[in-house]
């Protein structure tokens, strides 16, 4: 049996960084020993399998304030720590998905002349990809048009890999409310979204009167959860591993518009109402949302414009019943479903090809 090479995966923070890296790790673990580098006090310890040898560093989120200098010192110290880890584990290749762990990892890898691949899942590249992408051997893109923002990088369009469950059909979980009413999945990403939770809280009475069934994922890091007692047609959870099954079997998703969510909706061909996070870097969540909103597969509502009235009117319009040849159907929802089919992107094995390419080249 040939000896496996060592792959360091540097991904941390939000599900948008972690889930694509997990998907890639699962695809290549038969040929590589996986070592995972993350950040303390984030989602990493809950999501990363023990077999991936998770190591965490203390890196705080950079902020524009008087302590910025000390944060850069912290990043520099992290770079030296990562150099030691790369040497200790005899790493042959580094794969990263952006985020605060990525910058020192890229610098450390280039110092040791270890090849680096970074994957950029957003349409508008993040800060690390923008400023450090040129140091990487390849920048893999979730969307084709991202190439125009990275002229000095070696870019390859691969799409964004998703969790394994999204590539197969999954039954609806037993705990989901039963009934004939439309099923809504409301979620704010792995960290939750206060604005989405709030608007749902305000409109819940209206939705239940309209016979909607609702699964509400409030997020792990929501410090003050909008606790509402579960009822026949409403279930609230902090987190679930059954997101693929929920999205595949629901009628409509209401969510933020991180790149991971956009690609999950595209894969499942699922209509949505998207409420982009307004403080995302370079407004990238709104740009992500526009990819499917412009094709008619989603309704984009800016957080500054959303209200109880706007939210309820939007849902009433989407679920307005039309009769055709004696058969009732949701005309706008059905049109949104057809439009989502045109957005299909297949990306499951593309990144695997490029990672395994380095087995031969290095």
UniProtKB/Swiss-Prot annotation:
It is found in: Cell inner membrane. Its main location: membrane. Disulfide bonds: none annotated. The keyword Plastid does not apply. GO terms for cellular component: plasma membrane. GO terms for molecular function: UDP-N-acetyl-D-glucosamine:N-acetylmuramoyl-L-alanyl-D-glutamyl-meso-2,6-diaminopimelyl-D-alanyl-D-alanine-diphosphoundecaprenol 4-beta-N-acetylglucosaminlytransferase activity; undecaprenyldiphospho-muramoylpentapeptide beta-N-acetylglucosaminyltransferase activity. Its EC number is 2.4.1.227. Pathway: Cell wall biogenesis; peptidoglycan biosynthesis. One of its GO terms (biological process) is lipid glycosylation. It is a peripheral membrane protein. InterPro entries: GlcNAc_MurG (IPR006009), Glyco_trans_28_C (IPR007235), GlycoTrans_28_N (IPR004276). Belongs to the glycosyltransferase 28 family. MurG subfamily. This is UDP-N-acetylglucosamine--N-acetylmuramyl-(pentapeptide) pyrophosphoryl-undecaprenol N-acetylglucosamine transferase. It comes from Prochlorococcus marinus (strain MIT 9215). The gene is murG.
């Amino acid at each position: 049996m040939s000896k496996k090479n060592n792959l360091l995966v540097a991904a941390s923070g939000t599900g948008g960084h972690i889930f694509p890296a997990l998907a890639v790790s699962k695809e290549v673990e038969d040929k590589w020993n996986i070592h995972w580098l993350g950040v303390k006090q984030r989602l990493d310890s809950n999501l990363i399998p023990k077999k991936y040898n998770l190591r965490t560093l203390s890196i705080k989120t950079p902020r524009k304030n008087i302590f910025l200098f000390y944060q850069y010192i912290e990043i520099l110290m992290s770079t030296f720590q990562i150099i030691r880890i790369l040497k200790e584990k005899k790493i042959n290749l580094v794969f990263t998905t952006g985020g605060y762990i990525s910058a020192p990892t890229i610098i450390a890898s280039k110092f040791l002349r270890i090849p680096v691949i970074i994957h950029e899942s957003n349409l508008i590249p993040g800060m690390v990809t923008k400023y450090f992408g040129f140091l990487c051997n390849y920048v893999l893109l979730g969307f084709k048009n991202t190439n125009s923002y990275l002229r000095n990088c070696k870019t390859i369009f691969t799409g964004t890999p998703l969790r394994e469950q999204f590539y197969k059909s999954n039954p609806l979980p037993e705990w989901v409310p039963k009934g004939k009413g439309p099923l809504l999945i409301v979620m704010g990403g792995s960290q939750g979204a206060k604005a989405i939770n709030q608007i749902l809280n305000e409109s819940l009475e209206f939705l239940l009167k309209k016979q909607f069934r609702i699964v509400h994922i409030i997020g792990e890091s929501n410090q003050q959860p909008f606790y509402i007692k579960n009822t026949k047609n409403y279930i609230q959870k902090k987190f679930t591993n059954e997101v693929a099954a929920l999205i595949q079997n629901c009628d409509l998703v209401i969510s933020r518009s991180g790149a991971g969510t956009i690609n999950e909706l595209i894969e499942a061909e699922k209509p949505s109402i998207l409420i982009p996070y307004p403080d995302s870097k370079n407004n990238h969540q709104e740009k992500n949302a526009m990819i499917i909103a412009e094709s008619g597969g989603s309704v984009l509502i800016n957080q500054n414009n959303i209200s109880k009235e706007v939210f309820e009117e939007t849902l009433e319009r989407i679920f307005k019943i039309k009769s055709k040849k004696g058969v009732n159907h949701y005309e706008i929802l059905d049109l949104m479903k057809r439009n989502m089919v045109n957005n299909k992107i297949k990306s499951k094995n593309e990144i695997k090809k490029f990672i395994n390419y380095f087995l031969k080249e290095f």
